[in-house]
Amino acid sequence: LPPQCVMVGGPLRADRYTAMKSRSIQQSRAVFAFLPSLEGSDEGTVAWRFFASPQDQIDAVLNFTRNLGISSYGVLAPTDTYGQRMTDLFLKAVRTNGSTVKIATYPSGDTTSWGEVMRGFVGGTMRGKTPVPTSTFQAAFIPDSWKNLELLVPFLFYQGEDRLVLMGTSLWEQGLSNRSSVNVANLDLA
């Protein structure tokens, strides 16, 4: 690279970053990599990332809930690959701190099963005509799209659960970016 080039956007692949590092390119130029993670202590000192990794997203929501004093969690995840990968990361992070977790999964495309899944997830029972949740967790991690979240939350309310802090991933942001308005009536704690 010419000496007047002081910033590098990239690389896209980890092996290319390793090659750049072996040639000490990041010592004389700011490197903004398109990678989910960087080697060792490089991040924030000699290189930066353009986007948050899945682990960054998990850490952010857990730090937020810990600041609220929350230590018990539920995970409500679709059975797709993304939902399972994010659930695995979440469980690993939560269990290292000794927190408790209740897990429920649902098929993304089959909304007919969601009512039963929610009943099991929050322990919904009826007291007369009033649904009463018996869930003991304080926050629910839902690694799914905003579109599905808007469908899932009413199922939680139908079971009487309106107390949970709802946590999600960057999929929520992507789902909101194209919308001119959002019905937030059901999402006070999301």
Model-derived regions: residue spans:
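Short, well-structured alpha-helical segments in soluble
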Residues: 1-6, 64, 116-135
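Short loop/turn motifs at secondary-structure junctions
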Residues: 3-4, 69, 136, 186
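Extracytoplasmic ligand/sensor domains, especially the bilobed periplasmic-binding protein
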Residues: 5-104, 165, 176
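Hydrophobic alpha-helical
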Residues: 14-20, 133-158
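Short hydrophobic segments within beta-strands
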Residues: 75-76, 142-143, 169
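Short, well-ordered amphipathic alpha-helices
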Residues: 87-91, 118-125, 151-155
